[in-house]
Amino acid sequence: MTEAAQPVPPAAPAVNPKVAAANEMLKKKMATATLVSKEVFAGGRLGVFKLKPDTTDRWWYQAGQYTTLGLDTPTGFVPRAYSIAGSPLDDGIIEFYIALVEGGALTPTIFAQEPGATFRYLSPKGKFTLATAGKKTLVMVATGTGLAPFVAQIRSLWKLHQAGVPSAYRIILFHGAAYSDEFGYAAELEGYAAARTQGFDFTYLKTSSRPDAARGWVPAIAKGRVNEVVRTVLGQPIPAGRSVEMPPGVTAESIRELIVPADTAFMACGNPGMIEDLKEPIAHLGVSTYLVEEFWKA
């Protein structure tokens, strides 16, 4: 009887010596934070990581910004930029929504960490913010973990709303994922959407490009790629042979009626193909503000 061959784990990516030296220099400039919470789901492919900075100083940022995280890995110190998923109002906790990339330079090490582990980070950066968008109606489009900056923004508005500060925004969020067990933060976002009767103007639409009941798909989740769902909502064509199916009780027209082009900004984060594909229909709608954010290194 012979044993079945065991799969060979992906080889760690080669590191350029100059890059490695630069990374070590950067490491010395980075502050430290402790991992206080780790929640992994979707078969271990997605995770929410919460860090608490070791400094006693208040770590302030604008919702929608990103920071650089770094860890020592088998090939040396590796830094990568990640959008912050937590709200600046989250009591000093920095939260991240991260996808595991097999064979990636950093994410396998991130997912191997447990509470108590030390991460390094830099000060926040970026202009992917509500202030930059500068419009009352915000159409947010995300694929996968590109949802992170939108969670930060929507959660911040909700916390202010709960504190008696009414939101000046109407937000429409489209979140696309391949499978329905990959919708991070769904329960939280559905709770906000249910609060429309309380004056919180938020619409949330999930869409699965590979709808499979065994992976959590239910009719309340739209079918189709998120960029094609947005195209359908905007009354623009999608490629021949492709299809979009809206959830029961939701029509493209009912969502389109919420969008006033003159006072609307689109914001997209995630797959570069999705971001590129939306340029034409957004321009056709007459919307001039289109903010994008892309991070694809692993």
Task: Go through each PLM region and give its residues.
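Active-site-adjacent beta-strand anchor residues
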Residues: 140-143, 268-269
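Reductase modules of NAD(P)H-dependent flavoproteins
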Residues: 2-9, 13, 20, 26-31, ...
